């Protein structure tokens, strides 16, 4: 025997499970996301080729690596970097991965939760398969006798894990919170990447590769999800109308990423003011490091912000 309370609960769940609007990603076309996925694959191929077969980029890779390696010799840097980098070790990663999946489920979006799990699993398995497949000893012209990174290091598993967590958190978050989540997720991915670079685990190109694997998987899964939604809505005998949620203004969407940039600049200025002589000498001696570190930060913020803007309602 059913009760009114149970019937209401069943109807409530059925509405969440069937209404495409509950995914927070529709009504949208899957076509742009398919193009983004193709562009991600192309960028991944170009990054790999440059890292292994273009002398200019190989030299730059090593120079940035040296800058991070020398940074680890500063007081307390190594211990802090070790703590942050290990947040994306397998066991902590599994615990962190539960968060975006749980958020999607709590918001009544089971298909989105499955998509998020697919990104988190697929991206990281892909990286672990690519590393031995593409393993090749790196050139060490600039390293000055220091041991190069292991041959099976591209793409970085830690960078893939960090960026996949950042991007799936953007997917899971409510629309009005996505700008803040994107900024925080990018900051997390950058912090993890800087940390394992300082520990000498990877070259910077490994970070770019890991970021691109995570981003490509994210947009590919979103494209698949939206394609399935399009087919389901078209085949429904009585398609229900969807009232779009209030759209976040472009100004509000860009405010948190902008604040993240200003915060990074303010932090750099604070360090420079505290130790001006040391910072100036270090920057002069490691110009490639400054450029490379900036590029990693810019790429992380661009990927998280780009996804947030693409999903903006």
Model-derived features with residue positions:
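N-terminal transmembrane-helix/juxtamembrane module of multi-pass inner/ER membrane proteins
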Residues: 1-96, 131-147, 284-296, 305-313
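Interfacial segments of alpha-helical transmembrane regions
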Residues: 32-38, 102-123
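Alpha-helical transmembrane segments
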Residues: 34-45, 122, 186, 258-267
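C-terminal TM-helix exit segments that contain a strictly Trp-centered aromatic cap at the helix terminus
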Residues: 44-55, 126-135, 195, 263-275
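Structural signal for the C-terminal ends of transmembrane alpha-helices
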Residues: 102-110, 169-176, 222-228, 306-312
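Hydrophobic alpha-helical transmembrane segments of integral membrane proteins
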Residues: 111-143
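Alpha-helical transmembrane segments of multipass membrane proteins
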Residues: 123, 127, 192, 214-218, ...
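Membrane-embedded catalytic cores of phosphoryl/pyrophosphoryl-handling enzymes
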Residues: 143-293
